[in-house]
Amino acid sequence: MVRLTLDLIARNSNLKPRKEETISQCLKKITHINFSDKNIDAIEDLSLCKNLSVLYLYDNCISQITNLNYATNLTHLYLQNNCIPCIENLRSLKKLEKLYLGGNYIAVIEGLEGLGELRELHVENQRLPLGEKLLFDPRTLHSLAKSLSILNISNNNIDDIRDLEILENLNQLIAVDNQLLHVKDLEFLLNKLMKLWKIDLNGNPVCLKPKYRDRLILVSKSLEFLDGKEIKNIERQFLMNWKASKDAKKISKKRSSKNEDASNSLISNFETMHHIVPVYYPQVGKPKLVFFSEIQRYPVNGNASPESSREDYTKIIEEMGNLSLKQSESLLTKNDVHEPHLFHNPKEKENLFAENE
């Protein structure tokens, strides 16, 4: 294995010291260091590289992030495909803009507090134990809320990304090959991320849900690319018109339902008030009996106001109430109402029909 030292950097540097120029002075001029795929397993003191801005250390065997405290001018750090289990010792890198940590053993996104200039964070393809997923420390998310614009969290067994709502300036999110399942969770997130114009969710179960693409396009006006496919204006406008038409139909249906319920309520109220009326059927030669018959129901005008309908009902009921039993009896004579089926004697039926003839 190889350790990254100042001597190694000096020997592999393209910078040639001038006469009477020391190695220290030469190292101060270095801005880019590329030791990718060199079997490096540790980082030694780089404090002399004061102007270092870009450091390439990907595809090595580094197991711990160390000795970068004095590289305060570092803006780009490439540490993907190493053996790093946790994010640490980076808080002094106040100018860091891009951090690449994909392909390591990181289980929690943490330790990035104080990196107020960090714009890109790449933590895809972490080699996690079976069944585990990548987690986010709320403190780190809060510290990156205003700066982070690009986030790559692909292939990390993630099933919920609603915590990312705090990243108010995020404009690109790559979350391919995770376990995202619910469209509603994505709608919630897109409602919060007002500057997001690109999101890639290919390889998630949610992509197979009905109307998945349509729903995300409708909920986000800023989105321009979804799963690698451009969202054209004509597509968005068509979906917006379709949704407006659907919403209008729902409103119309609700209004019709309310009107119908109001009409049914009026009819129900009428039925419960004096719904039976005494009717006399005098029998020939028998004691007079009183039968009760249901009042006839009349359709209610849907346009009539509830007040006028109640007045009509009250009037009908009052007229019925004024009809006394004696008046009802006097209005019906033997010859007016006949109920042959009530006679027990057949001769009485024959006499009755003979009188009518």
From Swiss-Prot:
Record PTM text: Phosphorylated; in the testis.
Q: Name one GO cellular component term.
A: microtubule organizing center
Give start and end residues of every LRR repeat.
29-50, 51-72, 73-94, 95-116, 117-138, 147-168, 169-190
Molecular function GO terms recorded:
actin binding; dynein complex binding; tubulin binding
Q: Where is this protein found?
A: Cytoplasm, Cytoskeleton; Cytoplasm, Cytoskeleton, Microtubule organizing center, Centrosome
| Alphabetic keyword roster | Cytoplasm, Cytoskeleton, Leucine-rich repeat, Repeat
Start and end residues of each LRRCT domain? 204-242
Stored PROSITE patterns: LRR (PS51450)
CDD domains cross-referenced by the UniProt entry: PPP1R42
Functional note? Regulates phosphatase activity of protein phosphatase 1 (PP1) complexes in the testis.
Q: What PANTHER family does this protein map onto? A: LEUCINE-RICH REPEAT AND IQ DOMAIN-CONTAINING PROTEIN 1-RELATED (PTHR46652), LEUCINE-RICH REPEAT-CONTAINING PROTEIN 9 (PTHR46652:SF3)
Assembly and binders: Interacts with PPP1CC isoform gamma-2; the interaction is direct. Interacts with actin, dynein, KIF5B, KIFC1 and tubulin. Associates with microtubules.
Listed name of the protein: Protein phosphatase 1 regulatory subunit 42
Source organism: Macaca fascicularis (Crab-eating macaque)
